[in-house]
Amino acid sequence: MASSEIDRSEAFQQLTGFPIGRWQRRLLDMLLSGEPPPGVALPTGIGKTSVMTLWLIARGFGAALPRRLVYVVDRRVVVDQASREAEALKNKLAPAVQDPLLRALRQGLGLGAEAELPVSSLRGGLADDAAWRLDPAASAIIVGTVDMIGSRLLFEGYGVSRRMRPLQAGLLGCDALVVLDEAHLVPPFAALMRSIVADASPRGSGGDGMPPGLRLMTLSATGREASDARIFRLEPEEAKEKL
């Protein structure tokens, strides 16, 4: 689906109720190129969870991005907040939506006439509603805690039967973009994720018969990785922008 900058900005406004910011526009351009940065260093309170919306728009407009976004954070309260945002995106893209741009986004995401965007939360105290694993070909958003996502990636999912563990590990480890929020609080898990991504690097893009691999994008407010030129961080003019 071809898009213009106006279309992308309008899509963001419709999905979130807010105009797109400069840094969000720049990050969206990177996602549209199919090359998300390995890390994003942004100050607290700037709206880092909007990366879910940016991924959704980029995929809807045809970007070569993983079909599953796995948003991981170690605090339940943030998991619940991110889950609410994901559910809001799901509702905005409901089958009954009439807006032409949002309908085009649905089509770009591969959602059938009656299909909803699969959104699932994986954290302690909540039952897995299974929406994310019913159709491996569907675009989906999974939000979960470090222990719930990590254990599944390592074939040891909490409360998951032995028969289902390979399926869940495969869905989270292939054709998935893991967004690790507050990565500075869980350095061992961040290191584990980088190791898993490195081990999976021989995987292809899907066109060579190999399943697309796992990709990682960390979110952090500390800027510990700022020495890495590939890390996305605010430019001076973006830092001055009113939130």
Label every model-predicted segment.
Residues 1-243:
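N-terminal helicase ATP-binding lobe
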